[in-house]
Structures are given as C-alpha cells and as structure tokens.
Amino acid sequence: MTIFQGRATRKPSGGKLRPNHSKRRYELGREPTLTRLGDRELRKIRSYGGNSKFALLRCDYANVYNPKDKTTRKVKINTVKENSADPHYVQRNIMNRGTVISTELGDARITSRPGQDGVINAVLL
C-alpha cells in the first residue's frame, strides 16, 4: 500500500473537504528507511526530477569529525547508545539523524540522514 502525503479529506469538525484535483504522483511518500548496524548495503531511489537518492540500509562505518583536532576519520561503529526518535531503536540498532553511537574514537552524534544521504557522518561528543 502506498503512502499519500496530500491533504486530508475531512475537516477538523468532521465535514467533508472537496478535492481540488485527483491524487498526483508527486504526493506519494514511501516507507521510512531504517538504517541498521551491519555490512554496508545501499539502495538507489529515483527522486523528483529524475535525480537519485541513496538509501543506506545497513552500515558499520562512520565518518567521524573530531572538533578538537579538526580532522575526520572513517571509524567502525560498535553499537547504538541513544536515540531520541524512539527508545526501541537502541535495542534494534537503528540509526538516524541525532542518534548517539559508540565508535572506536568514543561516542559520536550522527549529523547526516543515512536513509536519504547514503552515508553516516558524525561529530565526536
């Protein structure tokens, strides 16, 4: 079943809204890409205007920026420590923007959107 991101058909009062147009392709959404910890796996998605996005399904490395040294290194991710989006994501090792991960260098917060960017960028805490 598809995800429709257009206007609802009912008003807050319960009255019916008349549609201005039928459903259009640009109003379609998709299921969220829940990036998990594991061997790297990408999926290419066609986006608006014929462009493409890369959804990261699984990954075990992150580009971690160290603000003290002002250097970036590719390091291995150990586990997911904290996720403000959903506490159950920690148990399932799901990573998204704002997730705190444990790496070889220490704890880091993810700054990219892995489900849409195709990479995991993070900043050391």
From Swiss-Prot:
Source domain of life: Archaea
InterPro entries the record matches: Ribosomal_eS8, Ribosomal_eS8_CS, Ribosomal_protein_eS8_arc, Ribosomal_Se8/biogenesis_NSA2
Stored Pfam families: Ribosomal_S8e
Cellular component aspect of the GO annotation: ribonucleoprotein complex; ribosome
Signal peptide: none
Record keywords, A-Z: Ribonucleoprotein, Ribosomal protein
Similarity field: Belongs to the eukaryotic ribosomal protein eS8 family.
Ribonucleoprotein keyword on record: yes
Protein's recorded name: Small ribosomal subunit protein eS8
Keyword Ribosomal protein recorded: yes
